[in-house]
């Protein structure tokens, strides 16, 4: 497959200034990701206290940790359909309500079954959040700033994880029965903040075009663009991608007809995709698979146990070392957000994955040495440094790029459902790792598990090298061409020419 080298593509946005309104919308949408990150991170420490309070075993802990992701599978597949029917904005609002209910139940948590129900409901919210936040951010962004804005949800996930770790450390000093319940229940507050913020967010202009609501889409496009000329160009590109028959437009507010070939989205996406769509789907599924198959969830969720295996024994020191993981993750994702639109997705991704291979191998070696020879000062230090290095390399590339890349490569008509498939694979792998890690460490040792992760990271590097072209600076409407497609039909070029020659009321 021929790879793009990251140069400016025709139609890319040359304007270096980020639109403040689009930035604000992306920030509000990303609050939902903070809640998800918090629910993920807080469980790493909360499980220590839950186990003591509710007298549960390792298997029940694995199920409690992993059920969030199994239920997220349901949420992500549902969100794909929901976001196409009621819109991106109201799907975000729905996910906030789901998180609110789940957080209240977990905070109440009088016993294990109620805790599981709350965790399951929160998991459905996770599926909604992971699918909708990057898609919404991508659809309101210009090409030149899409990497930055679309990486904000991943940054907010990391901030949420960090807040979860800090919550573990602070509330862990309270009584056993109260501490972990406050850790879990406090996640309800960001849901309320999002519920207020959603009232000030506009709908995605691309979704509005798909609904034939061009007048509304046009007004929002002006708000999220720096100039009317930029808004006009982006609006015309969306009309082309959405296959709107512009010859039937008398006035923008007068209604339009979308061209419909009778093909369902799922048939075009999965059952009988064109070659370009097939490559896009493989790329999206592959990057989501490898994001969690390389072991990041094991470190995020079980870092206190990993550090304990390495020789850290004090509960306070375990939780502090875990806070260090959260700080490292957040810091390097912040760096990544500024590099994505400058360096490009591909270079960062390959560098990130290569670094992960070395960090995982180093961690596996150090943990194996501790397993065989007992506490060794150098092995303890190496294991902690390797853990932080793995998190750093993951966070500067594979972590944020997974969501940026998979949310931008699908054609508009397939984006919501395509993104939901990627999230579903992501959650399956996340659940697989989180629900099997403790069992695997008993079977092949903790060091052995990280040797496996290192091998998977090698396979990931080769997959990314051959299957993922550069997308930096390319408009969303041009992605299908990047993967070798010419658009929905052979007359796409004619449709583009036709669109550019017709004045859309209000822009000219």
Swiss-Prot record:
Annotated GO biological process: lateral root formation
Cellular component GO terms, alphabetical: membrane
Keyword entries, A-Z: Membrane, Sugar transport, Symport, Transmembrane, Transmembrane helix, Transport
Main location: membrane
A Pfam entry, by short name: Sugar_tr
One MF term in the entry's GO annotations: carbohydrate:proton symporter activity
Listed CDD domains: MFS_PLT (cd17437)
Residues that span the membrane, as ranges: 21-41, 60-80, 90-110, 120-140, 147-167, 178-198, 280-300, 318-338, 348-368, 384-404, 418-438, 448-468
UniProt membrane topology term: Multi-pass membrane protein
PANTHER family: POLYOL TRANSPORTER 3-RELATED (PTHR23500:SF453), SOLUTE CARRIER FAMILY 2, FACILITATED GLUCOSE TRANSPORTER (PTHR23500)
Function, in words: Plasma membrane sugar-proton symporter.
Name of protein: Probable polyol transporter 3
Lineage: Eukaryota, Viridiplantae, Streptophyta, Embryophyta, Tracheophyta
Gene: PLT3
